[in-house]
Amino acid sequence: MADNFNFEFVSPERLLISEKVSEVVIPATEGEMTVMAHHAPTMTVIKPGVVTVKFASGKTGKYVIFGGFADITPERLTLLAESAVPVDELSRDTLMKRIELAKAELDDTENHEHRTKLEQFLNAMTHLNGVLVPA
């Protein structure tokens, strides 16, 4: 049986999770990363995607994250989200609103670095819209 570790998942709106877990899969910018107890210390940027949590009880939870930052130590994972919601609370309207805002910002942006980040965000949001939210 895998060891458990402390997991804090925080967004500006609320504390989503603060409890013992056995495993968390996060959408890091370098690719999906599975975090377990005794993980090497790491700090990474989180891209929009799905966070999958395996709780100490054996239950699994899925959350959509819209970007953020992860601080990983051997005993703890702290996930600071720009915004996040449980998958079952996500609506097509929420995703479409974020996509439209990003498109409008992209149209008004001339900075190449910012345009690239917006294009990556739009790609992730479009993918989530097609995969997670039923028509």
Swiss-Prot record:
Task: Give me the gene this protein comes from.
Answer: atpC
What family is reported? Belongs to the ATPase epsilon chain family.
Question: What Pfam families does the record tag this protein with?
Answer: ATP-synt_DE_N (PF02823)
- Give the membrane topology, semicolon-separated if more than one: Peripheral membrane protein
Give the UniProt keywords, A-Z.
Answer: ATP synthesis, Cell inner membrane, Cell membrane, CF(1), Hydrogen ion transport, Ion transport, Membrane, Transport
Assembly state and interactors?
F-type ATPases have 2 components, CF(1) - the catalytic core - and CF(0) - the membrane proton channel. CF(1) has five subunits: alpha(3), beta(3), gamma(1), delta(1), epsilon(1). CF(0) has three main subunits: a, b and c.
GO CC annotations, alphabetized: plasma membrane; proton-transporting ATP synthase complex
Record's HAMAP family? ATP_synth_epsil_bac
Its annotated function is as follows: Produces ATP from ADP in the presence of a proton gradient across the membrane.
Main localization is membrane
Q: What is this protein called?
A: ATP synthase epsilon chain
Note the InterPro entries from the entry.
Answer: ATP_synth_F1_dsu/esu, ATP_synth_F1_dsu/esu_N, ATPsynth_dsu/esu_N
Molecular function in Gene Ontology: ATP binding; proton-transporting ATP synthase activity, rotational mechanism
Top-level taxon in the UniProt lineage: Bacteria
The protein's location, in the record's own words, is:
Cell inner membrane
Keyword flag Nucleus = no
